[in-house]
């Protein structure tokens, strides 16, 4: 088995081994992974954080050792808490990194960083505060950053910043935590899931107080939440049908 680490800010993770393939997720600076298959230009990887799989360009990561991988995997993540920061290499060149990037491998990559970091589990009350960091970020299928993010990437990154692990897709996240029977039982920071006409869970958002929800739909935005689903305050209509509320923390 071979191992890798992302040494660039935001790297696309694709469904197939081609630049034109669907963006299924993104690999952020400091993310580590197992290399499942290597081709001339592409590698199929499995991310350590959420076991998500996809194809990454061979020019956009560095191979690492099994020992380094295991060391980094068991370490408590040290995360960038600023929207944009910079790390510096041995040539004094700056490299941008974004909110939620992992900084545990700085010494392995011969990089330095003197910005703000966060590590460990935070109180549940911090979830909404972290969610506001992504407010108005444009929607991007497969995205995980303030410059483009999808609904489950948003919830995953917000929870990650507070020391909690969610899976990558909304349907996967819906398998986590404890189901609540009523909205009234929920607390700010709980997750609400929404399904389509076929009953497939396709959307997720973070519940706020007073029956509001923050979620990625066009952009990261705040709408009303009721027993039917999400009521879009701009369109004056329901846009998502509520399926289940889950308490993960």
Predicted regions and their residues:
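Aromatic- and glycine-rich peptidoglycan recognition patches
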Residues: 3, 10, 62-64, 180, ...
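Active-site nucleophilic cysteine motif
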Residues: 131, 145-162
């Amino acid at each position: 088995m071979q191992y890798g680490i992302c040494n660039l800010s935001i790297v696309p993770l694709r469904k197939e081994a081609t630049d034109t393939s669907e963006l299924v997720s993104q690999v952020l600076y400091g993310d580590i992974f197992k290399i499942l298959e290597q081709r001339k230009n592409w590698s199929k990887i499995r991310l350590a954080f959420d076991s998500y799989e996809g194809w990454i360009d061979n020019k956009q990561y560095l191979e690492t050792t099994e020992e380094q991988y295991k060391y980094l995997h068991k370490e408590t993540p040290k995360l960038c808490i600023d929207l944009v920061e910079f790390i510096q290499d041995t040539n004094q060149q700056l490299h941008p990194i974004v909110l939620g990037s992992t900084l545990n491998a700085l010494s392995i990559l011969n990089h330095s960083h003197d910005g703000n970091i966060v590590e460990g589990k935070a109180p549940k009350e911090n979830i909404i505060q972290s969610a506001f960091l992504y407010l108005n970020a444009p929607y991007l299928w497969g995205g995980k950053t303030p410059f483009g993010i999808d609904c489950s990437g948003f919830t995953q990154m917000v929870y990650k910043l507070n020391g909690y692990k969610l899976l990558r897709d909304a349907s996967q996240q819906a398998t986590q935590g404890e189901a609540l029977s009523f909205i009234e039982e929920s607390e700010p920071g709980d997750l609400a899931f929404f399904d389509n006409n076929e009953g497939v869970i396709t959307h997720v958002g973070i519940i706020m107080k007073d029956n509001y929800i923050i979620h990625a739909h066009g952009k990261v935005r705040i709408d009303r939440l009721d027993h039917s689903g999400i009521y879009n305050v701009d369109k004056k209509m329901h846009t998502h049908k509520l399926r289940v509320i889950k308490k993960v923390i």
